[in-house]
C-alpha cells in the first residue's frame, strides 16, 4: 500500500477573473461541477469554483505519480462532486485498471480571499 498526498491553495480573485472567460469554465469543469457552482450565488459561486479548482489540483498532485506517464490527466477527468452525505468526492473520468485499487479522499475549505483543498490517495499495488 502506498499513500500519496496533494494540497493546493488558490486566491478566489484569480478564479473570479478566469470565470469571465467562458472557455475557462468549459475547459476546466464538468457539467456537474458547473451546475453545482452556478446554483450558488455571488461570493458562494466564486468560492465553489475556487474550491473545486484547488481540489482538482490537489487530487492531481496525489494521483499523478500513479497514472502518469501512461495516462495524461486533464482537468475534466478529475471531477469534484458532493455526495449524498454532503461530503466532497473525487470522480476519476478515465479508464485504467489501477482505479480499482485506488481510494481518494478530498477536503475543501474557503474564505472570501482563498480556497484550499487537500487530497489523500491510497493505492494498493497488486502483484501479478
What are these model-predicted stretches?
Residues 1-128:
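Core catalytic alpha/beta fold that binds nucleotide/phospho-ligands
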Amino acid at each position: 500500500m502506498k499513500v500519496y498526498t496533494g494540497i493546493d491553495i488558490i486566491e478566489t480573485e484569480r478564479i473570479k477573473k478566469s470565470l469571465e472567460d467562458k472557455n475557462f469554465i468549459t475547459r476546466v469543469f464538468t457539467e456537474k461541477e458547473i451546475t453545482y457552482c452556478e446554483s450558488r450565488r455571488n461570493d458562494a459561486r466564486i468560492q465553489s469554483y475556487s474550491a473545486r479548482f484547488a481540489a482538482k489540483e490537489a487530487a492531481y498532485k496525489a494521483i499523478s505519480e500513479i497514472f502518469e506517464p501512461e495516462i495524461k490527466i486533464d482537468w475534466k477527468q478529475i471531477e469534484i462532486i458532493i455526495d449524498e452525505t454532503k461530503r466532497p468526492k473525487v470522480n476519476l473520468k478515465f479508464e485504467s485498471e489501477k482505479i480499482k485499487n485506488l481510494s481518494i479522499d478530498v477536503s475543501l475549505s474557503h474564505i472570501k480571499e482563498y480556497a484550499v483543498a487537500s487530497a489523500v490517495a491510497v493505492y494498493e499495488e497488486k502483484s501479478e
